[in-house]
């Protein structure tokens, strides 16, 4: 389904009944790599606008909420717990900083919930254990916060298959995470996608499935926004892999 609006660089996706919510980053000035490091970072912060889009089942834009402040403008993968959307917005560079917002999907009221001294690219609300799990740039590190945002754990991610881009809570303390690994085979660049079932207590991947499908633009189908659900006995995967003039792809099995 073509989306009937400028999507910029999509990041995360949630479906609520017949509506969709999607985060995206609009870069107005791209970060520039620094060598040597600039102010302790490997690149400049750049500039941009964070978006939380709401659109309907026909791809028509209903709302566009701007998120972030100053150099914090990069929304990531996000979660919905039946009441609120939990959306991280970070600087567009590793080892930086982020704000996690609690957003009412009806009123679009956005309240800063948590400040983190790192780039947070995804958040899951673990309702079974009454806590939040986040991941940093490339999902190399997991963070665990209590119900009020108090830090509880910081753990290296043992999963080396793909960098998680978008994760969502599943009942009984699990999460499904989609992501991509950008590889070079010989001299050929390759995007290898994947889906992982994550145990939110141990933070280990219970199962991981490679996803080799590519869009006509050459992007892995799990490159960024991923939404997985069961629909009338079928497993449904919905993804938005491409930038700017994007298409929502739907795959069903079962």
Model regions and ranges:
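A short beta-strand motif characteristic of beta-propeller blades
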Residues: 1-3, 60-68, 109-114, 150-157, ...
